[in-house]
Structures are given as C-alpha cells and as structure tokens.
C-alpha cells in the first residue's frame, strides 16, 4: 500500500509519512540511558503517541532495551475504584505486549496482588525477569483521576528506588498536561503528602509543533514517493496556517493530495492549501470539533471571549490559562500575551460560536447580489440594516458568549452572505479593542471593523485610525466601522441602528454603523 498523510490515530511507518521520534525528542535517549523517570506533555494530536511508539520500537530493535508504550486510558471509568482500574489496565498491557514485543520479551503472567498494588507488582515482576533493562512509556496518564491517579503515582514512586533490577529502568508518563497539574486532578497535593505528585521525575518535556523545515521534510516524503511536488509557497502557507500543528499539517496535505489534486503530475500550490483549509474548517473534523466543544466550558470562555472582542484579559486563575495552553488552543506570543494558536483555530472559533445564531437565522433572500450574481456592497449594507432592525435583538439571545453577542450575530449574517461563494477572514487579539473582518466575494473585497462601546467615550476616533491601518493592508479605499453600544439604559439595538459617513485619517471613506 502506498504511503499517505495520516489524520486518524498514531502513525505507522510502513503506511504513513512521519518524522523520526528521535529528531522530535533529541534529549530523550540520554534520559533513558540515565535511568530517569520523566514527563512528556503536549496538546492532543501533536504526535505524542506516534513518537513514543516509534521510539519504543527503535529502542527494542537496537537490542539494548525492552521498551514499550502502554496505555492507561482503559482505567479512566474507574476513578474511584483503583482495583477495577488496575485489572482493566493490566489486561490491556498483556495484549499490547503481545502485539509490540517479540515473544522472548513478553512479560510474565501478572502476579496476584491487592488493589492499589497491582500496577507496581506487575512492573516489578516484569523487570525482575526481563533479559534487558525495561523501559515503559505510560500513555494517557491524565485520563486517570482521583483515587486511581493517586494510586498509580504512588506505586511508581514506591518502586522507583528498586530500579533497574526490580522495577523499570526508565518510565515516561505521557499526557496532555504537565505533572504540576496532576495534583489538581487528584484532589490536591496534600493527598499525596508532597508538594509534587511525581517528585521522582528528572525532566518535564514537551513535544513541540513542527518547524518550517520539518513541514518541508514531511511533505518531501510524498514528493519522493510519488513525484508530486509541493511548491515552496504551498509549504510556507501550510506552516503559516497551522503554526506547525502536526494534525493540521497532515490534514491539509491529505486534502490537497487525495481530494483536490489527485493527478500526481500537478503540483500542490498555495492556492490548493487554502482550498484545503476551507474544507477542513467547514467540515470540522474530529480534531477541530473536539476543540470547539471546549469553547462552552467556563474556564475557556473567560479567556476566549475577551480575545474575540479585543478586550483586556480579566483576572483569571493561572491554572485556567495553563489549561488553554495545554489544550493547544492558545499560545504565548513572543511579543507578550496570549494569542490563538494558529490561523486555522482563529477561523474555527468564531465560526463555531456563531453557528447557533446562524441556525436561528430566518430565511433571507440574497438581495445583496446584482443580476450577474456579483456582490453589491451598497445593497449588502441595506440588507444588513433591515436584517438588524427586524431580527438583531432576538438573535442576541442565541449567542453563547453574551459579551460579544452582537459580533456573533453579525458574523452569522455575513456567513449567510458568503455561503453563496465567498470567504470571511478575521483578526482579533487581547487588548486590541476590536475585531477585523475581511469579506471576499468574487472580485469584491470588503474590510469591516467591529468595536464595542461600554463607556461614555465614543470609540469612533480610535476606530477610524485602526480601520485605516487594516484597510491599508488590504489595499482598500473604503470600509465599514460597526460600533455596538452596550451601555445600559439604551433603546433596543434594532431601533437605534444608524449609519453615517466619516473620513479616516488616511482619507478613506468609511461607513459608520451604530447600534
């Protein structure tokens, strides 16, 4: 079977394009050689499981170690019953060992032991009879919680001093969150009698996104296998859109090569990558859908809502910010502050949040189109004003984020517009005081800026300056500035909507819409 780009589960080197795990985790071999216990944490679907399965295989094939990746996930339903969790986990481990290890390296039958001791007893018995030093990577450690998580961590700590003769030579805990957060899931550090729930760890490592050169290396594997070329611009665009997030990098390439350009004599261009991006965002595959589900959690909403509106981040618990970082939903900008992790997520988040408003939209005739189906900006303005007068206020209730409900309803309307053959692009950031939208429909390009007025000071002057800069980047001479007035005691938004023309500092004609 020819190799392809993988988006479902761990990669398998015989059928998937993939990067070497030793390249992605260059310091890990030295940690293992030094009999260290360690943590590897990273967001979901960045290749943790793939890398560790491949590394275990490399270590075993070298003849130096018996190395294996084992999962703890089957113990997740038994958070209050360590005994049941241990039995489920150990059954899974026996099956995995039969699949991944040669017969002469299989573990013995697990010895009988009391609940709360079975994991440690099994690892001890295996280490004692192993003909090579035993290296174990325990995946999905943060699937466990409460009593079961405490029990597993304590058993590993208890056996640590007996390594390597009577306990594994090296153990790696693999999960989404860092060790500092295990105590949160286990009910607090006082229940572990230590300030750290895993104080035997030597290092806490993370698996980073692909670099630009790694994206190029991955895509080059396809070129070498098929002859189909990814242009330099396509590789750069893929890296820009994904920030190197491995699932997204693979997903774009999969769409490009298996759906959009099946003819291997034709190159994959930047335009093809952009088309692949639109398909992914519209489809919202499992990876994107799982992130979207998180948006309704209060600790996520508290941080994402001000990012969308351009407000300052309120006082939030450090653990909430770390949670979003560990999810891979946001990242720390080199310039300071939190930003959405990559441009694809930046598109997905407002689309998902405006979906409820989209589903609540009444049937709207596309009166914004000319007879030749081109977009008419003046007709679009009139259609929006009429829509807002009739439906704006009721639709605000359908928006999941109250503070930016007007933004979401406006975006729902604009999505109805571009569904006929256009695109929306958004820019937003903490503390920017705005959201910028670029609407493209055929040859028509429109720049729109959204601002919220919460205080007496009118944001018009600042908005004109900001919109001027945005329109300059788009090469446009006109744009919309939409100001949503959220001060108390005002008439309904639909009743007070108005428009006026203003000239920006750069001499551009701006349509100011107030509501």
Functional labels for PLM-detected ranges:
Residues 416-443:
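Active-site metal-binding core of divalent-cation-utilizing nuclease and nuclease-like domains
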Residues 92-151, 161-170:
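Mid-core helix/loop region of P-loop NTP-binding domains shared across ATPases and GTPases
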Residues 8, 67, 72, 79-103:
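Conserved NTP-binding/hydrolysis module of P-loop NTPases
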Residues 213-216, 220-327, 333, 364-370:
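Winged-helix-like regulatory helical subdomains adjacent to P-loop NTPase cores
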